[in-house]
């Protein structure tokens, strides 16, 4: 159903933003005293499927038209596949724009923070069969960043039916996703099957 607005983290205790029907569902410590940077928007009363989910750090995802999860998206990736550890920015605060009950459209604002970057995001979610999200971000770097990934996606892949010879497992395929479907700005549609090489590769 629709969400009228909620304090999902960051504001001082007592900020009058959480409607009673939502606040009753949250543990007292979470609803009033602690930051909450992971949350789910459910399909409606009596369902167990997610409309969308923010999963901590800068991860977010939606289950799509068939209620099947695959890839997760991230707000930002910093120093992926570098000789030093990757940095994981996180969303620290969320705001939900007021919507009508049972609305298929929701707007969420989020602040991001990390040692290297800070920024603000606007997520415009529309559910009509599948889910489409339009994202606008303003990012401010605190220092030089060797490698920054904008609009990164993440998933899990061991092997698929196309490279079954790489595996020593009885199952025909083991993955959350087996390829990347691209719809370019020029209207071209591309399909890139995933692979599991012995070393990191970029393209």
Model-found features: residue ranges?
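Acidic, contiguous internal or C-terminal segments within carbohydrate-active enzymes
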Residues: 110-156
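A general structural signal for short secondary-structure junctions and capping/turn motifs
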Residues: 29, 86, 97-100, 124-130, ...
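Extended, loop-rich substrate-binding clefts of extracytoplasmic carbohydrate-active enzymes
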Residues: 74-128
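Structured loops at beta-to-helix junctions and adjacent beta-edge loops in soluble globular domains
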Residues: 42, 111-113, 185
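Short, surface-exposed beta-strand/loop "edge" segments at domain boundaries and coil↔beta transitions
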Residues: 3-8, 116-119, 189-190
């Amino acid at each position: 159903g629709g969400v009228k607005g909620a304090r999902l983290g960051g504001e001082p205790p007592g900020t009058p933003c959480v409607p009673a029907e939502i606040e009753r569902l949250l543990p007292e410590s979470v609803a009033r005293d602690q930051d909450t940077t992971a949350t789910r928007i459910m399909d409606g009363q009596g369902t167990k499927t997610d409309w969308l989910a923010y999963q901590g750090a800068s991860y977010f995802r939606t289950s799509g038209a068939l209620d099947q999860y695959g890839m997760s998206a991230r707000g930002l990736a910093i120093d992926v596949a570098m000789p030093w550890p990757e940095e994981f920015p996180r969303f620290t605060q969320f705001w939900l724009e007021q919507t009508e009950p049972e609305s298929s459209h929701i707007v969420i604002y989020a602040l991001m923070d990390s040692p290297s970057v800070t920024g603000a995001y606007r997520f415009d979610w529309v559910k009509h069969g599948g889910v489409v999200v339009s994202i606008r971000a303003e990012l401010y770097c605190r220092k030089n960043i060797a490698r920054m990934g904008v609009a990164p996606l993440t998933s899990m892949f061991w092997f698929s039916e196309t490279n079954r010879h790489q595996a020593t497992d009885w199952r025909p395929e083991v993955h959350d996703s087996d390829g990347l479907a691209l719809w370019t700005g020029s209207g071209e549609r591309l399909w890139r099957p995933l692979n599991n090489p012995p070393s990191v590769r970029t393209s």
